[in-house]
């Protein structure tokens, strides 16, 4: 399922956050836990390193942001909220979301997990998101406005 969404929320709480408190790379677990994805694409590219796959991810508790307002607008129950700052020149590699934080808190919850990907800033040249649609065809997204995004499972 892929659905276009638009969030009317003060995004400054995310934009003004201190992203210097976390630096990491997404590849450390992907090369081990998600080999099946990369095998379909010819293997994990040797050109990806910890130096060009940096992310700075923050998690927000209910109260720091209003889970109820977010959930009402997105028509979903919000369990976790995180944001990722991706430094220039870095990429998030091909991956499958594992809903790690959700599964830690609710290991026996059988409900379908969905992800809302909301753009926090207007699109600028060089920004792009690649994803597979419901037919597993590759799509590219650009030219978005802050608050727009996608909901997918």
Model-flagged regions — what are they?
Residues 1-83, 91:
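Non-heme Fe(II)/2-oxoglutarate
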Residues 71-151:
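Catalytic core of non-heme Fe(II) oxygenases with the double-stranded beta-helix
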């Amino acid at each position: 399922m892929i659905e276009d969404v638009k969030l009317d929320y003060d995004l400054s709480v995310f934009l003004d956050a201190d992203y210097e408190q976390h630096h990491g790379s997404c590849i450390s677990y992907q090369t081990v836990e998600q080999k099946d994805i990369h095998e379909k694409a010819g293997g994990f590219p040797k050109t990806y390193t910890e130096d060009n796959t940096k992310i700075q991810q923050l998690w927000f508790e209910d109260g720091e942001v209003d889970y109820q307002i977010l959930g009402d607008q997105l028509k979903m129950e919000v369990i976790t909220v995180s944001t990722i700052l991706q430094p220039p020149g870095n990429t998030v590699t091909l991956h499958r979301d594992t809903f790690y934080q959700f599964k830690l808190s609710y290991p026996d919850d059988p409900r379908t997990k969905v992800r809302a990907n909301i753009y926090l800033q207007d699109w600028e040249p060089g920004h792009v998101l690649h994803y597979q649609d419901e037919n597993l065809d590759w799509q590219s997204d650009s030219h978005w406005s802050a608050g727009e995004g996608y909901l997918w499972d």
